Amino acid sequence: MENVVIIRYGEIMLKGNNKRFFEDKLVKQIRHALSDLGKLKVYKAHSRIYVDVDAYDVADITDRVKKVFGVVSLSVAKRFEVDMDRIKEVVLEEIKDRMLENPGIKTFKMESKRGDKRFPMQSLEISRELGGHVLENIENISVDVHHPDVSIHVEIRDQAFVFSNKISGFGGLPLGTNGKALLLLSGGIDSPVAGWMVGKRGVDIEAIHFHSYPFTSDRAKEKVMDLAKILSGYCGAFKLYSVNLLPIQKEINEKCPEEEMTILSRRFMMKIAERVALQNDCDALVTGESIGQVASQTVKSLNVTNSAVDLPVFRPLIAMDKVDIIDLSQKIETYETSILPFEDCCTVFLPKHPVTQPKLEKILQSESKLDVEALISAALEALEVEKISIED
């Protein structure tokens, strides 16, 4: 008998003629997530992916695999030759183990799947036979098919599988199946969630961060690095580009109306991000903006910001409430880092009354007072790049 992780995927099943491409990408991503653990056997069969895990830390493996985009759920199962008497023994062992872990278990349910049609019993018959065996051999337990304390699963294919746990994954599509995008990563709550959401749709990401050093601190930059490392646990290793926006902000502060500081700064960020994206084969920009959340995120403000670039701008949080964004940031474990009290470039020269309904003509008029190309070129010349990985 061997231990194996059974990995299930969902949306990939709907991909028709492209299904194999997505499956192969998912296998590749799972292998990559486990690559430093040794030569684990990861393989595809019966529209599932399997990882042989004997002699390995199973908890570590499941924790890594559940973060791989495309994985809907996984289970740690016992695998052995198909034999009904042996299946009965393993089912008893499984339910007894669960009862030792949780003495409060009083009800159970059997769920059986007969993938191998050569097996003489149908799925419902298998469940009845095994359920009866449990009732005959374990005291103080009963069947509850609607709200059981524990469900025991049996799958019969070329071999038999028995398990009682289902660990949820995040679903989505495997990384590397939908191009590459550049994430504008701040130190806040929203942008890491936006990057995660785009990654979940199979988009590889790189990231760019704007700071205002020395008006913003080294610790603020370290915070962004920490967020990027958490994100790399889901999205894989990526490049983080850092740009000092302070010289541009000083020029805006000196030559443009105070209330336009935020919107003009955002336009410069987008222009610089687009240059970096195009130089690195990115197909889109990604931001954490949500309608109406702050002054620069009204519909008119977003329209003025968009007009600064030609690349598509993905805003996966656009209609989400803040509480929903916070919930997701907690789920992906970026929240506690995001709320650390370190300033970012948006706090520098913050206007008392930022324009919320900007007119593009007026913003372009103010922008014409600046040497836009020279400011962008200087920022790009001072660009810093770091490779971000969860292992760092």
Swiss-Prot record:
Which Pfam family, any one, appears in the UniProt record?
A: ThiI_fer
Q: Which residues form the THUMP domain?
A: 59-167
Tell me which UniProt keywords the record has, alphabetically: ATP-binding, Cytoplasm, Nucleotide-binding, RNA-binding, Thiamine biosynthesis, Transferase, tRNA-binding
Q: Which GO terms describe its molecular function?
A: ATP binding; CCA tRNA nucleotidyltransferase activity; tRNA binding; tRNA-uracil-4 sulfurtransferase activity
**Biological process GO annotation list?**
thiamine biosynthetic process; thiamine diphosphate biosynthetic process; thiazole biosynthetic process; tRNA 4-thiouridine biosynthesis
Q: In which pathway does it act?
A: Cofactor biosynthesis; thiamine diphosphate biosynthesis
SMART domains, A to Z: THUMP
Q: By its UniProt entry, which PROSITE patterns does this protein fall under? A: THUMP
Source superkingdom: Bacteria
InterPro entries registered for this protein in UniProt = Rossmann-like_a/b/a_fold, ThiI_AANH, ThiI_fer, ThiI_N, THUMP_dom, THUMP_ThiI, tRNA_STrfase, tRNA_sulfurtransferase_ThiI
Catalyzed reaction equations: [ThiI sulfur-carrier protein]-S-sulfanyl-L-cysteine + a uridine in tRNA + 2 reduced [2Fe-2S]-[ferredoxin] + ATP + H(+) = [ThiI sulfur-carrier protein]-L-cysteine + a 4-thiouridine in tRNA + 2 oxidized [2Fe-2S]-[ferredoxin] + AMP + diphosphate; [ThiS sulfur-carrier protein]-C-terminal Gly-Gly-AMP + S-sulfanyl-L-cysteinyl-[cysteine desulfurase] + AH2 = [ThiS sulfur-carrier protein]-C-terminal-Gly-aminoethanethioate + L-cysteinyl-[cysteine desulfurase] + A + AMP + 2 H(+)
EC number annotated for this UniProt entry: 2.8.1.4
- GO CC annotations, alphabetized: cytosol
**Cell compartments where the protein resides:** Cytoplasm
Task: Report residues binding ATP.
Answer: L184, L185, H209, F210, R266, G288, Q297
Give the protein family.
Answer: Belongs to the ThiI family.
Task: Tell me, in a sentence or two, what this protein's role is.
Answer: Catalyzes the ATP-dependent transfer of a sulfur to tRNA to produce 4-thiouridine in position 8 of tRNAs, which functions as a near-UV photosensor. Also catalyzes the transfer of sulfur to the sulfur carrier protein ThiS, forming ThiS-thiocarboxylate. This is a step in the synthesis of thiazole, in the thiamine biosynthesis pathway. The sulfur is donated as persulfide by IscS.
- The protein's name in its UniProt record: Probable tRNA sulfurtransferase
